[in-house]
Amino acid sequence: MDQALRRKTLERFEQHRRAWDTDEALRTLYGRWYGLVREKLPPHELGPWLELGSGPGFAKNVIPELELSDVVGAPWLQHELDAEQLPFEDGSLGALVLFDVLHHLPHPARFLAEAVRTLRPGGRVVMCEPYVSPVSYPVYRFIHEERCDMSVDPLAEAAGTGGDPFEGNQAIPTLLLRRREEVERRFPQLRIAGFQRFAGLAYPASGGFGRRTLLPMRLWKALLAIEDRLPDAVFRLIGFRMLAVLERQ
């Protein structure tokens, strides 16, 4: 990665850290979602928990035991590394956490192979990623800055994107989970141990990074409370996010 791109990436990290400090809706959502991730982690005694693509480092606020990493180093990160070429010994990790990372990887299948190699039996990959539903698709496809291409093969050698770490295809995680049998056939040491859809309209209404919440905070919290009571079947139609757990056999 050239120096100009490294500087650009670090600037984005800093922008996101400032947004975290000033945006209550953002902290609420991401705090909840990292809480969901924590619930799915294996016992820490199994081995280190490593987050890939930690970027601004929000995870430490909810899961202080996590070791943080990214392709570009920063003072709050413990490792600078490539998720597709992990610098760890075979069977040395307890968990790999990816939060909005899988859909940015140039070669998702290479990462899955590295997960098989580095995780101990019983170790887990826990991923919080975009979910493409009938309601979220037009938002991801036509409004969001990242692309959403449902035509790609998520296990193909060139499934993802390259170059800028912030480029991505938000369809990759959904496409991968739709091909569950193929994933488990190609990587028999990985079993899909959990899958959950969540986050309805309260997510885009939060404004995300760099935008103000679209509703008064009181109304936004009311919308979030309503969504908390909705069953999974509803999020099949309106969900914007997913949590997936892959367990090393």
Which functions belong to the PLM regions below?
Residues 125-159:
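Conserved class I S-adenosyl-L-methionine
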Residues 97:
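A conserved beta-strand element that flanks and buttresses the S-adenosyl-L-methionine
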Residues 235-249:
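Core SAM-dependent methyltransferase catalytic element
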Residues 1-84, 242:
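Conserved N-terminal segment of class I S-adenosyl-L-methionine
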Residues 109-124:
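A short glycine-rich, Lys/Arg-flanked "PGG" loop and its adjoining helix->strand segment in the class I
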Residues 100-101:
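Short catalytic micro-motifs in class I SAM-dependent methyltransferases
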Residues 170-195:
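Short alpha-helix
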Residues 85-90:
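Short conserved loop adjoining the S-adenosyl-L-methionine
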